[in-house]
């Protein structure tokens, strides 16, 4: 059997692509080395932020606004346990922060609902937060967080119900191209399709070693908290920049545990074996202490944590492009630790590619040619 589309990697983007392409009427095969959702990539840990006024650059705003529409649509499939929680996101940092300047610029350009607060205003609204006098906060009322594993599970189930073929716990070991399409090699045999999407995450270089993607081991952890830090108490999700430039992110507490991680830093790795579990690197348990001690002093001890991986591009912007020399294969990689919020729209972009539809978005900034 020859498929219209084979998806290599069915985590964040791949699960979305499988659903949207199958819903469009294509004959699709989703593949993954494990059984998604799983603990081997970048999507586990239950929650991910979604921010609209984007500090990483204005080029992302049209994408994230479409992503939000798709997240709202997906959430309607799980109304008892919503995939998107509109908690709001407070972005904290020094008044001269370049990241916050980008957030403010994005908000102005796209007329987004963002409120600027000075240090006293931040601490008056959320007494649990402490910041220096030179800090500001940019509060995104309409943003919040996503339940990442639930989203992937939902997409995979919806795709299956729509007739999508799924080959999980079966790594793809090679990709071949010919005039007739794409062939993948797996332990279960060979499969053919007219087109392929490669969204294999951290270990995409096992298949395509020439790609400029660097795996980095990262950790996040849950710390003892109480009801003051919960969504019910209107405590928001957050990003925070310390005076030394270190960047953190976190979520409202659930079940008396507040999740936080450090965005920058981490350990460069070259194999899955090097992504050791949480606490096997000495700094894991204390990585968030500088932020917690200064900004959230009421948070208690570390309860537990987890390790994940970022697939970093050289400039930490996404790679969305066809494989050089093979216009029938789309790469979506290098998401660099800020990609999950875009998974829905990237999956839709992948489905459009499979249907020979022109994308509604300017993807020029994400081309591989920028590294030449």
UniProtKB/Swiss-Prot annotation:
Query: What cofactor requirement does the entry state?
Result: FAD
- What keywords sit in the KW lines? FAD, Flavoprotein, Oxidoreductase
One of the Pfam families matching this protein, by short name: DAO
- Give the sites modified to S-8alpha-FAD cysteine: 308
**Cofactor stoichiometry and binding remark:** Binds 1 FAD per subunit.
- State the InterPro entries in the record: FAD-dep_OxRdtase, FAD/NAD-bd_sf, Me_Trp_Oxase_MTOX, MTOX
Q: Name one GO cellular component term.
A: cytosol
One Gene Ontology term of the molecular function aspect: flavin adenine dinucleotide binding
Give the E.C. number(s): 1.5.3.-
Task: Tell me the residue numbers annotated for binding FAD.
Answer: 4-34
Q: What class of enzyme is it?
A: oxidoreductase
Catalysed reactions listed for this entry: N(alpha)-methyl-L-tryptophan + O2 + H2O = L-tryptophan + formaldehyde + H2O2
Family note:
Belongs to the MSOX/MTOX family. MTOX subfamily.
What is the recorded function of this protein according to its Swiss-Prot or TrEMBL entry?
A: Catalyzes the oxidative demethylation of N-methyl-L-tryptophan.
Alphabetized PANTHER family for the sequence = FAD DEPENDENT OXIDOREDUCTASE DOMAIN-CONTAINING PROTEIN, PEROXISOMAL SARCOSINE OXIDASE
Q: How does it assemble?
A: Monomer.
Name of the protein described by the UniProt record = N-methyl-L-tryptophan oxidase
